[in-house]
Amino acid sequence: MKFVMILIAAAFVASPAVAALDGAALYKDKTCNACHGPKADKPLMPNYPKLAGQNAAYAEQQMKDIKSGARNNGQTAAMKGVMHLVNDEEIKAIADWLSKQK
């Protein structure tokens, strides 16, 4: 029995299950929809960017730059306050989801 448990544990460690993050759910859960709209195509304010259809790599880098402070202007003040809630994997998932929206 001990041997079986060791085999199960070894198999679990050897094959890490990487669950795909749900970009749509993260977009909502991280409150992106509050300013950029439910589908990222109708921002709350005219000066907020439409994110639907944005290039994934560009969107990912912009979010990372806002989070790190590398992009720091008047437009980023509100986002800076919430980006600490989003990790790099979640940023990538959100950016990928945004790129697939129309």
Question: Each predicted region: which residue ranges?
Answer:
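Electrostatic cytochrome c docking/interface patches
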Residues: 12-28, 42, 47
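Small disulfide-bonded, cysteine-rich extracellular recognition modules and tandem repeats
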Residues: 13, 35-38, 54, 82
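Axial heme c-ligation environment in periplasmic c-type cytochrome domains
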Residues: 43-52, 65-102
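The canonical Cys-X-X-Cys-His
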Residues: 31-38, 94
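Sequence context surrounding c-type heme c attachment/ligation sites in exported
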Residues: 20-33, 52, 56-61
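Positively charged n-region of N-terminal signal peptides that target proteins for export
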Residues: 1-5
